Amino acid sequence: IGKDTLEVLEKNKVDCACMKGLRCCGMPAWEQGDLETLRVNAQHNLEILIPFVEKGSKVLVINPTCSMMMRREYTELLDGEDRERAKKLSEAVNDPSEYLWNIRNEDRFNTDVNSMPNEKISYHAPCHLRAQGIGFKGRDLIKKITGSNVKTVMECCGHDGTYAMKVEGFDASKRIGQKSFDGMKSEESEVWATDCPLAALQFKQHAGVKPKHPMSILAEAYR
C-alpha cells in the first residue's frame, strides 16, 4: 500500500518523502492502558515530524487509525509543550485520499488512466476515518479518476484496533461485523475497497474477500 501510495502521489506531482525512524502511533499501547508507551512514541514522532510541519509540509498517514491518533488523540493525551506541538501536527495530518481530493481542481491532478477497474466496486467506510469527519475521499477519488460505480457500506467491520486479534474478542468482532460483511457481498462486486488495512484483514477472514486500498486501485489504473 505504501509503494502504491507513493506511485499515485508521483502521478499527481506531489513532492513527498518517507521519514525514517517513526514509531507506532501508540494506539495498541493505549488500548492496553499503557499511556507511558503511547506518550513516548508520540513525543518521538513529534520530534521527527514537527520540523517539516513548521516548514509547511503536510503529513500523509495511510492507516486511518494512525491518522486519527495524530489528528485527534495526541492533542488530548499529551500535556504542555507536547500538546502545543501535537496541535500543529493535527492541523497538518491528511489521509492520502483527502490530500488528493483537495487538489482535484489543480492542473497537476491526474485523471489519465491506462486501465480501468471493474465497473462496480464495493467500498467500506472505516470507522476511524469517519471519526475524523473528512467524508469518503477514497471512494470519491475512485469515482472521479476511474468512473467506476462505487457502492458504500457504512457498518463497522468489528475489528476495532486490537480487539479482533484477541481470543476474547474474536467471536464478538465477527458478530459485530456481520452486517458489513453482508453489505459488501450484497453488491456482488468483483472488487472490494477500504482505506483500513485492518478492516481488509477482517473482511478476508470472515467474508472471503480482501478489499484493496483506494491507493492500490488507483495505482493499478495509472499503470
Segments predicted by a language model, with ranges:
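Iron-sulfur cluster-binding electron-transfer modules in prokaryotic oxidoreductases
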Residues: 1-223
